Amino acid sequence: MIEWKTFCTIFWQRFNQNKLTQAAGYLTYSTMLAIVPLIMVVFSIFSAFPVFNEVTGALKEFIFTNFAPSASDVVGQYIDEFVNNSKQMSAVGIISLIVVALMLINSIDRTLNSIWHDTSTRPIFTSFAIYWLILTLGPLLVGTSIAASAYVKTMFENASGFSFGLKLLSFVPFLSTWFIFTVIYMVVPNKKVSIKHSAAGALIAAVFFTLGKQAFAWYIVTFPSYQLIYGAMATLPIMLLWIQLSWTFVLLGAQLAAVLAEVRSEKMINLEQIEETK
């Protein structure tokens, strides 16, 4: 019990020291600036692979449902319009959009490394290569996951006696979120992060993210004060609030993984000191 209280105390101290609520606000601002360029790049990548044409709609639904609960239809229409407008841009404009998308990834990189108190920097070409891989391979991995889930779901629906399998598939969004957070916590920090600590932090973040999404959607539908106050503009503050909460959950999971590593490191040091005194 004492160790658990100590762990919670350390976690809360680190959460406040790193000013993660302010960091979530900064990432929210960066996300709002980069969301259209990022989505444009993602769907441009998908258009280059005809095999993903059938799952593009499913991917849109996945993105909008997770990042704009209760307003996904409206946000989807706006994003589609913005992306269509971006297709008329010149090469210089497209490059600038890609740069903005990469800047968001850079912001995430610096924020997560500050949680692990890592001040080292990667060479600029290495950083660019990593960011570009995240920007290109990330959507492809998500698309592959959605395509595989859709294929398996079709198999279960066409076969009798597989209702249990369909119920299991309902956990795919949660498991996908857990997997994505785990990979982020392992790959982005410059320090080596164990898969055990990454998975533990990612699990908590995924639980908060999933429950928070449902609670947020319920609140917006049950207490439609934003719609009454802002009218047609209600989508913007709703989306801002949810992105802020989402980043708070992500950073909370990252801080948990970092504290787990910190506590383990301190235990190892204490054990070594005990061994030396024997």
Swiss-Prot record:
Record carries keyword Calcium: no
GO terms under cellular component: plasma membrane
InterPro entries, per database record: UPF0761_bac, Virul_fac_BrkB
UniProt subcellular location: Cell inner membrane
Keywords carried by this UniProt record: Cell inner membrane, Cell membrane, Membrane, Transmembrane, Transmembrane helix
Entries under Pfam families matching the protein: Virul_fac_BrkB
Membrane topology: Multi-pass membrane protein
Keyword Cell inner membrane: yes
Transmembrane segments: 32-52, 88-108, 123-143, 168-188, 203-223, 232-252
Family recorded in the similarity comment: Belongs to the UPF0761 family.
Protein name: UPF0761 membrane protein NT05HA_1801
